[in-house]
């Protein structure tokens, strides 16, 4: 452990060559609980120079919230050597948030602990925003819904980062996050939105729920969703007029296309984000 002070030379902080050796940037994790301060202090007193911080879960599985299951899945499996528990139950899984500082502005990359479900303002929809539950994609999934905030203004409430909804365990975590949002905000969705891909678990749930509850369902093409979200962000920031004509270009892997084939990118023109 070494503290770098103002005025120190760049050589004051040295890292092992194996740490992010091919990356131009480093991430910094701040201790956000008193327990982490105690762990860091104990490590320093025992001349431990490094601690590995990672989420408590198996690969492709949700974070463990139950001590018994954590013991079974993490300790018995050899992932960890010991388990430090607490007498307070964990109600909701939250990963560490990840942010970047761009031109002096903090830009969230992964909104989770400390950020979600903080609302994002949608002033262009004031007075016209129905309660729409958006079920998210399959990879790096979140859930979102639109409704009025405490001040009566239109807003989008985004869940914590959930991860890749590809199996029963992660779908259960997705479902738990959705249920918690609905209970917390007393939601009564007037419509549902999901990814166009027919095999995504979140989309399958949305289609079945829309059928059972006789709700409108909007199926959104994957790349189109990226372009629309970038447009909405620019409108909220005042950089784009609501009726501006836009050429959107999205390169983000593959996604189900409106013609039934798999698309790799999308060039899209729109008279407005609506």
Report each predicted region and the residues it spans.
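Conserved small/polar residues in nucleotide/adenosyl-binding loops
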Residues: 268-273
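Phosphate/diphosphate-binding loops
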Residues: 76, 80-98, 219-235, 239-263
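Active-site-adjacent structural elements in enzyme catalytic cores
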Residues: 1-193, 197-212, 261-264
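Short hydrophobic/aromatic-enriched beta-strand-loop microsegments
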Residues: 51, 216-221
């Amino acid at each position: 452990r070494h503290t770098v002070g103002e005025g120190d030379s760049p050589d004051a902080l040295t890292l092992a060559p194996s740490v992010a050796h091919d990356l131009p940037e480093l991430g910094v994790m701040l201790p956000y609980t008193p327990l982490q301060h105690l762990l860091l202090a104990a490590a320093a007193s025992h001349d431990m120079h490094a601690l590995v911080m990672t989420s408590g879960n198996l690969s492709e599985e949700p974070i463990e919230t139950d001590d018994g299951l954590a013991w079974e899945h993490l300790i018995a499996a050899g992932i960890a050597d010991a388990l430090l528990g607490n007498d307070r139950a964990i109600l909701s899984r939250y990963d560490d948030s990840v942010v970047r500082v761009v031109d002096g502005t903090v830009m969230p990359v992964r909104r989770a602990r400390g950020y979600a479900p903080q609302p994002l303002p949608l002033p262009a929809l004031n007075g016209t925003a129905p309660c729409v539950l958006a079920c998210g994609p399959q990879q790096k999934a979140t859930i979102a819904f639109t409704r009025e905030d405490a001040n009566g203004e239109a807003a989008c409430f985004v869940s914590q980062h959930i991860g890749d909804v590809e199996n029963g365990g992660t779908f259960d975590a997705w479902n738990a996050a959705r249920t918690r949002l609905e209970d917390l905000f007393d939601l009564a969705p007037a419509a549902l939105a999901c990814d166009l891909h027919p095999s995504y678990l979140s989309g399958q749930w949305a289609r079945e729920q829309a059928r059972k509850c006789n709700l409108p369902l909007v199926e959104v093409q994957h790349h189109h969703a990226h372009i629309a979200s970038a447009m909405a962000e620019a409108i909220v920031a005042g950089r784009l007029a609501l009726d501006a004509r836009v050429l959107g270009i999205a390169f983000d892997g593959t996604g189900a296309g409106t013609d039934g084939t798999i698309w790799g990118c999308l060039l899209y023109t729109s008279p407005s984000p609506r």
